[in-house]
């Protein structure tokens, strides 16, 4: 069964829940609720990546993360940190988090030595932007898929050459604005992600929760995307996704239980 990453955004401006969990105690409380709801891993993000985001500095990002990581580690909870800054990734290595989730796919070689010496798994995400937050750009679905496969090939090779054990790498094809503003690109990648698993023989994470392409197809705003999110997540589960990253852990966990019971 797919493992669930429960999202906790310790931010002011994340696209779906910015500001709700900026307070440390609220972030910890929410994380504990997500674990009760069925999350296998808590994915902490302290700097938003939405197209209209305001940049958060390294010091502030670490300040937001540190007490939450400490509290969750004390309870033995598996932790992922969603960050693309090498300095924050170094902090995460020191804190011995279980996963580092990089929306830019680890583009900075200066962090590779530290990554190689660590034990955490690395979520290597693809985006058409390569560097920076998601942007609203038009994309061609087939061209994006071809480019994505080449990107994964090159980045996996670079990490392995630097000493990162290949089996520690998890691939995330990106969704929503990370694939551009054309919803058909996300649909095509969602349909074809098993090709990524087959080509690289690595685990894949799918993160469709509340993403823009779902809203474009259904006409729903961010807070009304539970049904389309769950439909896409269950599709990914049936197609063999190893990890599902979601805001709505309880709904996904319950749906997975029913699907398993039905066989």
From Swiss-Prot:
Protein keywords: Antibiotic resistance, Folate biosynthesis, Magnesium, Metal-binding, Plasmid, Transferase
Residues annotated for 6-hydroxymethyl-7,8-dihydropterin binding in this entry: 101, 172, 211
EC number annotated for this UniProt entry: 2.5.1.15
Segment forming the signal sequence: none
Keyword set includes Metal-binding: yes
Residues where (7,8-dihydropterin-6-yl)methyl diphosphate binds: 82, 101, 172, 211, 245-247
Pathway participation: Cofactor biosynthesis; tetrahydrofolate biosynthesis; 7,8-dihydrofolate from 2-amino-4-hydroxy-6-hydroxymethyl-7,8-dihydropteridine diphosphate and 4-aminobenzoate: step 1/2
Domain Pterin-binding as annotated: residue spans: 2-257
Residues where 4-aminobenzoate binds: 49, 177, 212
PROSITE patterns: DHPS_1, DHPS_2, PTERIN_BINDING
Transmembrane regions listed in the UniProt entry: none
Keyword Repeat included in the entry's annotation: no
Reaction equation(s) it catalyzes: (7,8-dihydropterin-6-yl)methyl diphosphate + 4-aminobenzoate = 7,8-dihydropteroate + diphosphate
Additional notes on this entry: The sul3 gene is located on various large self-transmissible resistance plasmids and on transposons.
Family: Belongs to the DHPS family.
Protein name per UniProt: Dihydropteroate synthase type-3
Organism: Escherichia coli
Organism lineage: Bacteria, Pseudomonadati, Pseudomonadota, Gammaproteobacteria, Enterobacterales
């Amino acid at each position: 069964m797919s493992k669930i990453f429960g999202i906790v955004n310790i931010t002011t401006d994340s696209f779906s829940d910015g500001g709700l969990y900026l307070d440390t105690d609220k972030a910890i409380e929410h994380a504990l609720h997500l674990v009760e709801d069925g999350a296998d891993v808590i994915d902490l993000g302290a700097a938003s990546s939405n197209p209209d985001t305001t940049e958060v500095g390294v010091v502030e990002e670490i300040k937001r993360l540190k007490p939450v990581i400490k509290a969750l580690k004390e309870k033995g909870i598996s932790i992922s940190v969603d960050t693309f800054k090498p300095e924050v990734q170094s902090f995460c290595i020191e804190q011995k988090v279980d996963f580092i989730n990089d929306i830019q796919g680890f583009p900075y070689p200066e962090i590779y030595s530290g990554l190689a010496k660590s034990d955490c798994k690395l979520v290597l995400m693809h985006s058409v932007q390569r560097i920076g937050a998601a942007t609203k750009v038009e994309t061609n679905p087939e061209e994006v898929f071809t480019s994505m496969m080449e990107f994964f090939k090159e980045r996996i090779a670079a990490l392995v050459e630097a000493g990162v054990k290949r089996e520690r790498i998890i691939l995330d094809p990106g969704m929503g604005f990370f694939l551009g503003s054309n919803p058909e690109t996300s649909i095509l990648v969602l349909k074809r992600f098993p090709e990524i698993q087959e080509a690289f023989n690595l685990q894949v994470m799918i993160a469709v929760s509340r993403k823009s392409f779902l809203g474009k197809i259904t006409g729903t705003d961010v807070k009304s995307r539970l049904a389309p999110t769950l439909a896409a997540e269950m599709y990914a589960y049936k197609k063999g996704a190893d990890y599902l990253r979601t805001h709505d852990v309880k709904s996904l966990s319950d749906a997975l239980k029913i699907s398993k019971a039905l066989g």
